[in-house]
Amino acid sequence: MAALWLLLLVLSLHCMGAGGFVAHVESTCVLDDAGTPQDFTYCVSFNKDLLACWDPIVGKIVPCEFGVLYPLAENFSRILNKEESLLQRLQNGLPDCASHTQPFWNALTHRTRPPSVRVAQTTPFNTREPVMLACYVWGFYPADVTITWMKNGQLVPSHSNKEKTAQPNGDWTYQTVSYLALTPSYGDVYTCVVQHSGTSEPIRGDWTPGLSPIQTVKVSVSAATLGLGFIIFCVGFFRWRKSHSSSYTPLSGSTYPEGRH
């Protein structure tokens, strides 16, 4: 390993310039769903260009650059292949992957996180229906999730038990969205049902349509008529009170001279 670091240092110093240069070593372990290592890679790069990589078939480090840097990659590989300790470590790369990853594999991959669900109306696309709903599902792990649409408690046939392809958020959680085009009627209830291993019960999000344009006009006219009638009633009532208070009011006692009845 000392020879490798010395080579990288010499390479960087020799090519130093105003733009800067970077030489780095990268090793990766490719694991399957059960956490079993399937592949091991070890590569040396210069300015993000691969120079040399470990080849498990031939048991050596071979050049990966066949352009202008090929002579450098070839010399680099020849020098590294003289390091017996490095070659021995690379030959044990796959078993080492298993020993290094298993202690924390279950804690990372066997965990679950339930999704958050929200249903909202969105702009319709690729449909003649006037309304489109979007069921947003996010923040869940693992990625497998099933989304079902229901109308008034009944499954919508074209959207029953659909497994969605989730997109990673970059924080070990996923997100996805399901769309439903429809022609709503007043009183309908649309429900997005999300099933995920992170929760024992399905998570539901409901949406109900508002009043139709005709119903909106009817309600507006009724409200305006009611308001106008109330105003007329108030005006008439106050005028009646005013006229009643200005009329003749009889006084107690006799208004005639004494002796007359």
From Swiss-Prot:
Domain Ig-like C1-type: 114-204
Cytoplasmic-facing ranges: 240-261
Any Gene Ontology biological process: peptide antigen assembly with MHC class II protein complex
Family: Belongs to the MHC class II family.
Motif position, YXXZ motif: 248-251
Glycosylation: residue positions: N75
UniProt keywords, alphabetically: Adaptive immunity, Disulfide bond, Endosome, Glycoprotein, Immunity, Lysosome, Membrane, MHC II, Signal, Transmembrane, Transmembrane helix
InterPro entries recorded: Ig-like_dom, Ig-like_dom_sf, Ig-like_fold, Ig/MHC_CS, Ig_C1-set, MHC/Immunoglobulin, MHC_I/II-like_Ag-recog, MHC_II_a/b_N
Localization per record: Late endosome membrane; Lysosome membrane
Keyword Transmembrane helix: yes
Cited SMART domains: IGc1, MHC_II_beta
Highest taxon listed in the record's lineage: Eukaryota
Name of the protein in question: Class II histocompatibility antigen, M beta 1 chain
Membrane-spanning intervals of the chain: 219-239
Topological region Lumenal: 19-218
Summary of subunit composition and partner proteins: Heterodimer of an alpha chain (DMA) and a beta chain (DMB). Interacts with MHCII; this interaction mediates rapid selection of high-affinity peptides.
SUPFAM superfamilies found in the cross-reference section: Immunoglobulin, MHC antigen-recognition domain
Biological role: Plays a critical role in catalyzing the release of class II-associated invariant chain peptide (CLIP) from newly synthesized MHC class II molecules and freeing the peptide binding site for acquisition of antigenic peptides.
A single GO cellular-component term on record: MHC class II protein complex
Connecting peptide as annotated region, ranges: 208-218
Disulfide bonding pattern of the chain: C29-C97, C43-C53, C135-C192
Record's signal peptide: 1-18
Pfam families xrefs: C1-set (PF07654), MHC_II_beta (PF00969)
Domain notes for this protein: The YXXZ (Tyr-Xaa-Xaa-Zaa, where Zaa is a hydrophobic residue) motif mediates the targeting to the lysosomal compartments.
Membrane topology per record: Single-pass type I membrane protein
GO MF annotation terms: MHC class II protein complex binding
